Amino acid sequence: MTENKGKVVSVNGNLVSVEFTGNVSMNEICFVNVDSTPLKSEVIRIKGNIAQVQVYEMTGGIKCGDTVDFTGEMLSAELGPGLLGQVYDGLQNPLAALAEKAGWFLERGNYADGLSGDKKWLFTPTAQVGAVLRAGEYVGTVPEGAFLHKIFVPFYLTGTFTLKSIVEKGEYTIKEEIAVLTDERGRDIPISMSFKWPVKRAIRCYSERLAPEATMETKVRLVDSFFPVAKGGTYCTPGPFGAGKTVLQHTTSKYADVDIVIIAACGERAGEVVETLTEFPELIDPKTGRSLMERTIIICNTSSMPVASREASVYTSVTLAEYYRQMGLHVLLLADSTSRWAQALREMSGRLEEIPGEEAFPAYLESYIAAFYERAGYVLLPDGSKGSVTIGGTVSPAGGNFEEPVTQATLKVVGAFHGLSRERSDARKYPAIDPLISWSKYKSVISRGKMEYCKAILHGGSDVNAMMKVVGEEGTTLSDYILYLKSEMLDAVYLQQNSFDLIDANCGTLRQRYVTDKLIKVLGSEYGLVLKDDARAFFNRMRQRFIDWNYTEFESQDFKDKERDIDDLYKEGEGRLTVDAERLLKDGE
């Protein structure tokens, strides 16, 4: 730590101006001393010998003349074994440790190490003495839950290094020296199991960045089939309050085809964060049968916490995600909600007296949001393995208005858009993703032709529904009315899904493809129906049989029996495949 000091010259909310001597750098961490209590802060602007710092705590009691200690370090996350299962605040203070230290009502100025320095880990060396290593290559492994946690050459080292010595297999703390590297100048560099990395710098210790192609299966039919997300891709879920964002997030984190889940609750209401903290330890991971928390990290900053630390929580979470990606793991980062982070940027921009953009958000809002989502990616690592960080950000636009700046800036950089609809959530159609406005640039688990065919039915049915609101059911032709019934059936049996049923919530790729083919056969047929009442009765019966089918185990005897019931009803309705549907089913297109 440097001896660089300064003194407070003005205070404006959580923005404090500090006069300093010596050298101070942007994003440097400093501590403002208030009645012998150090408050963690970050330098966000420098003018001459005045540094403007944002304080990560409540600033009551700060006065002109208070001393400030500059550390010479950036805001950093501690990386090493012991991160999984932790609940942190935005500055990587473990909340459980803070509660033990200070009780339930935290006083400002309390900080704790991100990783326990006392716990011992079983280290197994994998690199041989004399090996030539670079930053991002590993020297050994440590078991952490269900994963082998790799111990890396620290990412901040540059150049090549020779492994001079390494400890034998045994139990060590994260602070103990486990190896010594020799650099190109012959200097010895001791390394331990943990090191720090600045959260605002992306970790780039990979060989190549690849295009995200493999689909990240969420087991949510509407997402995987119609608006898929790729591993290493990005997506956003904007929607009004109460539209089902949190339940969709829980379902995704539980069933998604990823190794690690990181939840950044930045600026959400305290009630929602408490709900997440109480429910996640009780959620059972279907892969292991154990608690989902064993492969989860939660970073929480509620809306009642200081505004500045919301920004830190977003960067801390993505840094932890990149760290586990470096091990060849697939990580899903769920940021809830990026709107609150943007509001924190707006507040600081106002205090800095910058020229405001639309709705008083800073003019650089788009570049900040883009820089965050660009840290997602699918990468090839030095050892030949592949890892990914997939970022899913929820946006909470006021009144569900998707035209506001945060949503629009997000839409420009993400690869998939899952727009939640108040109308669908009020009608209890969950997940409430609106299929008419959502989109994705990634590859679906079903063929493109089948996906477009189903979307055409949905759009056609929506048009007929809009017309019926004006002219009534009597004013529509039988063919239009049947199209409307088909779209309603597709919505009810495929787009809607019960997140609380173990079978229906977990709908894998094979089942989605099988059910899609059966649906196209039913929806792509013409029937011997002459009255609208007959058509309504027929499709209501068909819909109920499909819904019952959804609740049966795939390829079980019950599944086959329910499928036989569907086929019998199809024959009863005198179904005849159209040319387009027949071609789709034959070609797989």
Question: Where are the regions that the model predicts?
Answer:
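Short, surface-exposed secondary-structure edge patches
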Residues: 19-24, 56-61, 76, 84, ...
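Short beta-strand-centered aromatic/proline hotspots
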Residues: 6-8, 39-45, 150-153, 159-166
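P-loop NTPase nucleotide-binding/switch module
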Residues: 100-156, 163, 173-233, 248-251, ...
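N-terminal accessory targeting/assembly segments
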Residues: 1-107
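C-terminal amphipathic alpha-helical interaction region
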Residues: 531-589
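Short, surface-exposed secondary-structure boundary micro-motifs
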Residues: 21, 35, 73-74, 92, ...
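Metallocofactor- and cofactor-centric catalytic cores in central/energy metabolism, strongly enriched
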Residues: 39, 48-51, 73, 135, ...
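P-loop NTPase catalytic core
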Residues: 224-228, 232-545, 555
